[in-house]
Amino acid sequence: MSSTTIALLSGGLDSATAAALAREAGHRVIGLSFDYGQRHQRELRAAAEVAQALGLAEHHTINVNLAAWGGSSLTDLDQPVPDQGVQDGVIPSTYVPGRNTVFIALGLSLAEAKGAERLVLGVNAIDYSGYPDCRPDYLDAYQHLADLASRSGREGHGTQLWAPLVEWSKTKIVEEALRLNVPIASTWSCYAGGDHPCGVCDSCRIRDAALREAGRPDLASR
């Protein structure tokens, strides 16, 4: 019987690649996506397309309305998404307060209910936006919490957080996505709320630069 892995699936390139790595490892993969009031709702359609293309065993989307209290340019429509690069040491306005902490908690809940051995995350701390909840020390601390706070953890067989991309460059992620036949054209990385990638937000810029470096400029937004 194959192992089960829960994949947090945003619809973006990173989470799709992480899910594909779990599938390559022979795991039964269950996708979990979140409608949290993000302005870029297009990513939810992308998540569904990716789940189907990768042949995930199940795919769930749940509502977690983080826009109710805002605090991020990804949820507050009156707050513009920045179109300049990330400054060193500055956490950008696209950081959503507590987002990964909430999402991982829900992923662990699903994992324990399904008897999943792993929860795979597409977080990346290298070529990304400096978010505090995408770093190895954060994940290590969360693993300790999960082991203490769950029945399975107390019994010695708790769900393990798996972040295979956390220290990869964006170019390496693109190269792995190509190797794994991830449907890159179906993924969505843009922070803006339009029907087409803006090409100027931080997420678009990082993605496009990596695609060009990996020899696939045809998949870039512009």
UniProtKB/Swiss-Prot annotation:
Record field: catalytic activity: 7-carboxy-7-deazaguanine + NH4(+) + ATP = 7-cyano-7-deazaguanine + ADP + phosphate + H2O + H(+)
Which InterPro entries does the entry link to? Answer: QueC, Rossmann-like_a/b/a_fold
Positions with a binding annotation for Zn(2+): C190, C198, C201, C204
Q: Name one GO biological process term.
A: queuosine biosynthetic process
Q: Any idea which positions bind ATP?
A: L9, S10, G11, G12, L13, D14, S15, A16, T17, A18, A19
Q: Which domain of life, per UniProt? A: Bacteria
Note on how the cofactor is bound: Binds 1 zinc ion per subunit.
Pfam families according to UniProt: QueC
A Gene Ontology molecular function term of the record? ATP binding
Q: In which pathway does it act?
A: Purine metabolism; 7-cyano-7-deazaguanine biosynthesis
Give the NCBIfam families listed for this entry.
7-cyano-7-deazaguanine synthase QueC
Q: What does this protein do?
A: Catalyzes the ATP-dependent conversion of 7-carboxy-7-deazaguanine (CDG) to 7-cyano-7-deazaguanine (preQ(0)).
| Protein name, UniProt field | 7-cyano-7-deazaguanine synthase
Q: Which organism is it from?
A: Synechococcus sp. (strain RCC307)
Gene behind the chain: queC
